[in-house]
Amino acid sequence: MRALLPLAEMGEIASFFAVDREARAGERLNIAMLRSSAAVARVTDLVRKYAGPEARPVRAIAFDKSPGSNWFLSWHQDRTIEVKSRLEVAGYGPWTRKQGRLHVSPPFSVIERMTTVRLHVDPVDQHNAPLLIAPGSHRSGLVSTPE
């Protein structure tokens, strides 16, 4: 989408993601701090228009993918979710920690109900596009690593 939000609202969102550029690959943010933002509310409303009225944000991650701090990332599927506590439930695992936060790989039936929304707060064009997507790959279920 182009011009999803006015420039001022994108600036508001960008201010939430002002992280130490040397800190780490992705800074996981406290979703509670985003709830009061009118710009985030507008994005949530747009997502609900397409994903349904029950859609809600569950995680926000800021990535600094600028030329000075970029890193290589091969094709992959995001397969983990952040959880508050560890409960042994059939189909969930393995467990990991990312920046001290607990994550688990859930059954694919959980993953396939999730939608990722990516906002670029810096100018993006065909020469610096930070993300490549394999269209339709979500219909293939869990894809093995070599694929």
Tell what function each PLM region has:
Residues 5-147:
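Non-heme Fe(II) oxygenase catalytic core, chiefly the N-lobe of the double-stranded beta-helix
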